[in-house]
Amino acid sequence: VSEQPRRGRKPAKPYRRPKKDPVRILAFDALRAVDERDAYANLVLPPLLRKAREKGDFDARDAALATELVYGTLRRQGTYDAVIAACVDRPLREVDPPVLDVLSLGAHQLLGTRIPSHAAVSATVELARVVLGDGRAKFVNAVLRKVAQDDLDGWIEKVAPPYDEDPEDHLAVVHSHPRWVVSALWDSLGGGRAGIEELLAADNERPRVTLVARPGRATTEELLREEAAEPGRWSPYAVRLAEGGEPGAVEAVREGRAGVQDEGSQLVALALANAPLEGPDARWLDGCAGPGGKAALLGALAAERGAALLASEKQPHRAGLVAKALAGNPGPYQVIAADGTRPPWRPGSFDRVLVDVPCTGLGALRRRPEARWRRRPEDLDNFAPLQRALLRTALDSVRVGGVVGYATCSPHLAETRAVVADVLKQYPDAELIDARPLLPGVDQLGEGPDIQLWPHLHGTDAMYLALIRKTAD
C-alpha cells in the first residue's frame, strides 16, 4: 500500500530535470569566455559552433540563433545592464557574473529578438537551471518576469536620462556605448544629434563579411559566383558575402588567393598605393603588418608594378600569420619579426611605407562589440608613445620624395590627428598630402587632407589615414 500524504499538505511535485538547450548553453559558454578570459567573440564562437556541428547538435538555424544571442547580447550590454539594474534589489556589481550573463541573454531575447516573451523566459530559466542550479534559477525567473513587463522602447523611457538633461548619458544608455566613447566619437564626428545617433546605431548593426580578391591571384568575378554575393561599395577588389555567409566555404579564401578584409582596410592600402611619388617605386614597407590583411593586398599591388614588399611585425606568432597571408604572392616579398621602433633596416630605404598602428580599436566596435566595455580612457595614454614612435620610424624609413601612410582603426582624435600633428612638428622635411583624390568615387571624406571613414556613411570600419610626403633631407 502506498504511503498517503499527511492530511492538509499537498503532495510534493516530482523533481523534473532541466531541459538542456544546446544553442543557449553554447551562447552562455561564449559569453563566459569573453568575460572570464577577455576573449573576443569572433575568436571564441567559431570553434564552439564547429564542435557543436561535428557532434550533430546544430544545424544552420541553430548556429544563426547562437550567433545572434552572443553578438546581440554583447552589443546591447549597456542598455540591458540598465534594464536589469532596475529589476534587481542590489547593485549589479553584487550579482554574480555568470548570473548576469544569463540575465543578459534573457533580456536580449525579450527586448532584442522576436522570440515570444513566455518562450524567452522559459528557455532562459531552463538554461539557468542547467548552468547555475535551481536556486539561482528562481532569481533569474523573477527578474526576467519584470523585464518582460515592457518592450525595449518602454524600458529606455524608464532608464535613460532625458536627452535635453544629459545628451551623452542618454545616448550611452540608448545605444549601449560607454559614455566616454560616446563623447570621443562625437568629438571626432562633429555635427549634431542625428549624425552621432546614426554612428552609434551603425556600431550595433551586424556587418556583412567582406572579401578582398588579391590582385593577380583572384578576381571579383570569381568571388561573385558565391550565392547572393555583391560587389563592394568602394574598393574594386571587394565582394560582400550574403548575410551569414561563411568565408571558409569560399575556395579562393581557403587557398589564400582571397581573404576577409573590411573595405575600409582595403581603401587604406589602395590610397597609399595610388599616392604619386617622385622617383623610383620599387621598395615598399608594411611596418605593422600583423595579422597580414593589408600586407597581402599591398604585396599584390606592389607585384603589379614590379616592386618588392617588406612586411615587419614585432610579435613572432603574428609574423607567422603575415607569412601565411603573403604565401603565393606573385611578386618578391619578405616577412620579418622586428620591433618597429628599433628597425633593422637603414633610414631612407623605402619608397612607400604603411604603419597601421596599435590603437584602441574604437572604429571596429561593430565587429568586436565587447571592446567597448574593455577599453578605458587611460588606454589612450598607453598607446600614445608607441603610436608616435612608429610614425617617427616610418618617416625615418622613407626616402626623400617617398610617402608614408599613418593608419588607425580608431577615429579618436588623440590617436589620429593629434599624433600626426605632434610628430610633424619634429619633421620640417615632411608634409601632409591630400588623400581624398586618391579614392575616386568615395564621398563624404571630410575637409582633408586626411581621411576618416565611418560605418554609417561608408559602411566600413572607422578607419583613419593620413598620407605624408618626405620633402627634403
Spell out what each predicted region is.
Residues 1-473:
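S-adenosylmethionine
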